[in-house]
Amino acid sequence: MHTGCCTTKFDTEVLIIGNGPAGIALSSFLSGMHPFYDATHPHENVTVHEKLLANHDFSLIDQDLSWSSNLTELSQSGRPLSVLYDMLVRPGADMGSDAPGCIQWELNRRREIPHMVIGETKIGGSWNEYDAEMLTVSFSDWMDMPGFTMEQWLGGRPLVKRLPSVAIATYLKKYVERLRLRKKFHQYFVVNSIKKIGDVWVTSGKRSTDGRSFVIRSKQVVVACGKTSPRKLQLPNEEHCSSNIVYDVRALKERLDATKKTVIDEDENYDTPSTSTCSPVIVVGDGVSSVDCVRHCLERDIPVVHVIRRTLRELRNVMLSRLSPIHYSEYTDIYRMMIGRSVHKNYQRVLDASITSVSKIHVEITTGSNREIIEMPYSTVAVCIGRESHFSTVFENAHTFLDYQSEQDETLFAVGAYAGDHFVRFLVGGCLRVAQHITGAANNNNVTAKLLPIC
């Protein structure tokens, strides 16, 4: 890379910031991995089949797929191409069908567009940070990257639908190696600034491994980093009590292990007391992450007070309510407790509630229409109210994105969670759309033309 004040060429044509599933999928598309409609496996939707059959000699990247926004079953999501891609690679997936996909993959290195992928972590992004034993919410085949599936990597269909997060992190690394993308990926790059100077994006920051600065110049930038920063309670005393507050199940496990009391009995006749007599863990939130924390505590006989912002009526419509007890029994069991359908000696819920004050020994929970205040002692507070991205602060100007492209600058894009696609099964379609934008621009311009220096 060039770090001087003046250079005769850019570091790369396209800079992808984020080395998780979104960055990996987009890198694959830009490296020449292209999807073609497989006419031998026609899709059951007649309109989709006829539209794609008419251009089946062209990859989806080279086709105008704007017609997809006119199909009701695709447009309702607001991301028609994401849904179209998903229904082509996994037809009938939501109905439990194992029908073969309608896509053939071809790797054409001559179509490669020069690009770099940088990330703050190891390849795989936030999948490296999750609790290794945590099972994915998505089924294993919903995690497939373009052209090399989870099933191909495993050497056969897995015996279970959901795999632990460590398997997903490993698959993503192996995928990058299998497609020979490794040289494009640069780990532990922390971005501090992104500026547009003329027609050039200048991205700068430091490497977390050695503190060395970097500067990358590119014609286009794609923000592919997820929402990695946990949302906090935003209470005045929260930072002062940070040693007692965690934001995911992995950190909760580590804290409980660190504070666990060991009873030493020389005569070996002393029964270890149940941990249910200690102050409870207070879990805040009503999503999957909060349920992971509740479940871990109950499995260890630790009392839990579950603080839920929603009312009972609202709680009946959350994502957890739609999970199948066949495949997600660990979540549906806790969900039944959340809505009062079942009870557990160590579980207490507080609905229509929020934590309004925290000290090192107790919290204040405000609940109900009359805003009753409950003072509750605690051992640990697990705050699981979602994640957010602070990445927008690195830009000089604010950007809004439509169809994955900045409305303020057509050379800036966003994919993955940053663009609102939170599940891998849908974010790959978003990457396909950005690949269309970038490939179309490359076809309309001389990519190899000499570029002016930045001074």
UniProtKB/Swiss-Prot annotation:
The record's free-text note on cofactor binding: No monooxygenase catalytic activity in the absence of NADPH.
Domain of life: Eukaryota
Gene disruption: observed consequences: RNAi-mediated knockdown causes abnormal binucleation of primordial germ cells (PGCs).
EC assignment: 1.14.13.-
Keywords of the record: FAD, Flavoprotein, Monooxygenase, NADP, Oxidoreductase
Principal subcellular localisation of the protein: other
Other facts noted in the record for this chain: Capable of rescuing defects caused by knockout of a human homolog, OSGIN1, in HeLa cells; rescues the activity of a RhoA reporter, membrane stability in late cytokinesis and cell ploidy.
Protein name: Oxidative stress induced growth inhibitor homolog osgn-1
Source species of the chain: Caenorhabditis elegans
